[in-house]
Amino acid sequence: MEWINEKAKTLKQGAIRAMFDRANTMTGVISLGIGEPDMSTPKLVCEAAKEALDKGITHYTPNAGTLSFRQAIAEKSYLKDLHYDPNTEIIITNGGMGALSLLFLILLNKGDEILIQDPQWLNYVAQVAYCDGTAVRVPTDLEHNFEMQPETIEKLITPHTKALMINTPNNPTGSVMTRETMAKIAELAVKHDLLVISDDVYNTLLYAGEEAPCIAAFPGMKERTVIVNSFSKSYAMTGWRIGFVAAPAEIVDRMTKCQENFNACANAPGQYAATVALDHPELCEELRQTFERRRSILLDGLARIDGIRCNRPNGAFYVFADISSFGLSSVEFCNRLLDEQKVVCIPGSAFGECGEGFIRIAYTCSDDNLYEALNRISCFCKKLMK
């Protein structure tokens, strides 16, 4: 008897996890690979969770999450001007990944196509495939700041295209979609009757005066937009698994029924703590300022290394650096950098074909480790240039 089904056999370990597994066998490694804040969750949020435990808030919540939390998201988050109904248009999920998995489960029929940027965080592609959908790559490049071009998107739309995914600020590139580009994409979505899935998880991490407009705010878009977000990056709460979706009531209703049958609800103390966190936007700002400082350290350091080329990304906590001049594949470059200098970066090919020739560098470590990692990368690149 074969116990494992054919779909499960298609799931593979990602290149990111493979790099960490190799690094874990070594000592003295500096990781510029991890896609999460290195700091702990703010004490105020942790104290709120303890308060929830002391109050006995340890039971199931409604499948859609506590109403008080949904109300706080509707009234206190960046969505407040869009007037989402907390009763019918917001659901609390097990992180942003839990939100996406529920969404794809209720959205996709076999053969439905979703347009996804390349390079892009590849869990999107795996989840779409597992739900019988087809991920169609939208190529981007450094010259256009890794921003999807509306004319490229339109050429890829077919009768099977159901949705378009956007992620701004972006993982892995750190790029932020301009308001002008977003407006054109919104027009395309209306013209072709597409759903837009907007992964906003990095939208508090913006630098150099950058703004991150919400596509649901454009004409005709609220009724065709699914906003996915979480508290993981903005409040350093990756391990808490607290996310949410704001979307048309029909979609939220189906996601809620799906959540009831698959995992009941998000954890109750985490929902309580995240509700408190929304009263303290200064916590997000403290994280943002830290990452903006580190961004400057990293970009200034990379600018002094011959052979490396990159843009100045204004969001998230990544730099997507061009290492093609060294004549190595991105996997070869990262493996040798780890072996010879004990620095973890992620090969760009892990994020799609358009990522080949690049490496993702996350500035999610201390300033001191960042300076040391830059010294090691510089030594490594000088050796390659000889």
Region annotations inferred by a language model:
Residues E2-E6, T10-L11, F20-M26, I30, ...:
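PLP-dependent class I/II
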Residues G56-Y60:
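A short acidic, glycine-rich active-site loop
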Residues A64-G65:
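Short beta-strand to alpha-helix junction loop
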